[in-house]
Amino acid sequence: MPKTIVEDNIDILVAGAGLGGTGAAFEARYWGQKKKIVIAEKANIDRSGAVAQGLYAINCYMGTRFGENNPEDHVRYARMDLMGMVREDLLFDMARHVDSTVHQFEEWGLPIMRDPKSGTYMREGRWQIMIHGESYKPIVAEAAKKSADKVFNRICVTHLLMDDAKENRVAGAVGFNVRTGDYHVFKSKAVIVAAGGASNIFRPNSVGEGAGRVWYAPWSSGSAYGLMIEAGAKMTQMENRIVLARFKDGYGPVGAYFLHLKTYTQNCNGEEYESKWFPALTKMVGKEYLDTEGQHLSHKPIPTCLRNHALISEVNAGRGPIHMVTMEAFQDPHLEEIGWHNFLGMTVGQAVLW
């Protein structure tokens, strides 16, 4: 018979223990040495969240200590890639903290690849650094477990509790154990919502069995949005959705393949297809965001959404599926080894396919 369990006198409750929640717990302990910190996670903290099965790159690292980039550079890049739909203050605030976070991960034992000549972190693109990330989440989870007074695994937080005495103030949260059905009540002075985003808002090309293997994490059910909106929180940047190009039967990330291994895409006829759609896209969005004549001179990236638009347009024109060509890169045994490691560290099924 399910029972009710009450956890009282919490100073800081962290709802969700993916990479964001684990980091929040560590920071909470750093700044609040004597506070009671509790984590509630709907899976198991060691392998939960978007990087649960590993990740082979950290996709944002300034490299300020190596003289590579500054936070201002990243704001300009993101503003371009997202076609102006950004909060620059939030971007800058994230960018100025990201390097110290990466250095912290390395101190905890995360293996980060280095350039053997320069000694700097190995880049796969301007912003991405390459890691051996199959144990990414367990490493960060260990720091969170040491920081928290209690960790409740298998607890799905469903609602935030509002304070009757103070308007617009959260006083805790409730949820249930997904294994036993036990009802949990957490009474807390503050709640950090680090629950998942929302995957599968759009129907993926992956259907049937593949629907559960899409990337981003299929278990991201919109909890972070639902909890906050119902409690009356102000939401910002909600109009920005990350939509990533994925390829037939692969599902997983391809950043290292494009940026480091220099692979490229083609349609079902073996043709390069992106450039044929660029003139029409330039008319649609203007030369500020897509100038095929001057893009290489300004070093501006072509916005991701426009690349996606070209891919979707090509498929709709009957020339899909779109493939990623790996044969040329894999003529180099060293690059082939990197390709294998890349997928085995985060998307094993993709390594078998490609």
Regions found by a protein language model. Give the residues of each.
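Conserved FAD-binding subdomain of flavin-dependent enzymes
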Residues: 45, 63-111, 230-237
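N-terminal Rossmann-like FAD-binding beta1-loop-alpha1 element of flavoenzymes
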Residues: 12-39
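Short, well-ordered coil/turn residues at beta-beta hairpins
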Residues: 16, 188-190, 194-195, 268
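Mobile, glycine/GP-rich and aromatic-enriched active-site lid/loop segments adjacent to catalytic centers
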Residues: 99, 106-159, 163-169, 239-354
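Conserved N-terminal glycine-rich FAD pyrophosphate-binding loop of Rossmann-like flavoproteins
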Residues: 43-76, 211, 253-257, 261
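Conserved N-terminal glycine/acidic-rich loop preference
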Residues: 1-9, 15-22, 44-62, 90, ...
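Glycine-rich loop(s) and the adjacent beta-strand/alpha-helix scaffold that form part
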Residues: 193-253
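Core beta-strand elements of the Rossmann-like FAD/NAD(P) dinucleotide-binding domain
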Residues: 7-10, 179-190
